[in-house]
Amino acid sequence: MAQSPQVLLSALADESAFDLTAVEQFTALAALGLEYYSLRFIDVGKGVKNVMKLSLPEIRRIRQLEDRYGLNVASIASPIGKTKLVDVDDGTRNAFVPFERYLARDVARACELAHAFETKLIRGFSFYPPKGSAPADHLEQAVDRIGRIAEACHRSDLTFGLEVEANLVGRDGHLLAEIHRRVNHPGLVLVFDAANLVVQGFSTAQVWSQWEAMKPGLGWVHVKDYRKTTARPRAGHVEEGKLADFVPADRGAGGHARILADLHGFLPALTRRLKRRGIPGVFVDLEPHLRGGGQFAGTSGPDGMGIALRSLCGVLDGAGIAYHLRDFDDLLAARGLG
């Protein structure tokens, strides 16, 4: 019998913890059987920090805890690209940073962190155009910046993953796919997230269309879902802090069953392509927001993360996609008895 293609399960670790301490995050993920996590917000004893703000002693302590809990970093879940594209007052609280400074400081820092945590992947975004403006009007400027970020990552032997999300230039799958096509760089891949489309008012059929548009550039998948509503117009600005109807992957309007069944067909080829860049495989990264989400983070708690993981595993089983959760053989190997 042919072996089923396999994904690597991961999660935004901070979603699994109420207080965001490293021990709380890692305990939850290890208990769920995960071996990979994406690093975003964490408390290593000096308060909660974004990964970009971690000190060298904090990095060393996290690495020690990773060894203790048997975890590896899937991606640096950075906020790169969540700044204004244009320095205008548009009524938002988004910051503007001159791009040359941003490239030399923030992007370089993200690359340093990826090497420190021994991952090949940095997650980022496609910049905020002025609120109320047409994203297509800012495509050329976004393409230029993202291309330079991709080149910086590539020169560091890393890959930049561009996530689809509301309010950005690449707010839908077609725009993000066009950015990827124009940048045309091996250091750039796309990160699909169904809920980030549903919250904008897109139907399940429209989410599918955007998945198809993103497939040629796909690098990995974020999994969260949202209960369909009709109260939110597609063209409008999404107030991310007010979103409250996130659900597991088998209950929302994102169409994960069809999407992951489709992934099954090209998963072996995508895995081979990523491995040529030193990436261990195709990550399916849980970011469920089951207790709520906002512009820069969300929370699910340890129980919510467990609910989300079991839901995802059921959808993967239905799609015929294999995955691995830690078992007794892994525990024996960790004890040196395997």
Task: Cite the ranges covered by each PLM segment.
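N-terminal substrate-binding region of glycoside hydrolase catalytic domains
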Residues: L12-D14, A28, L32-L56, A77
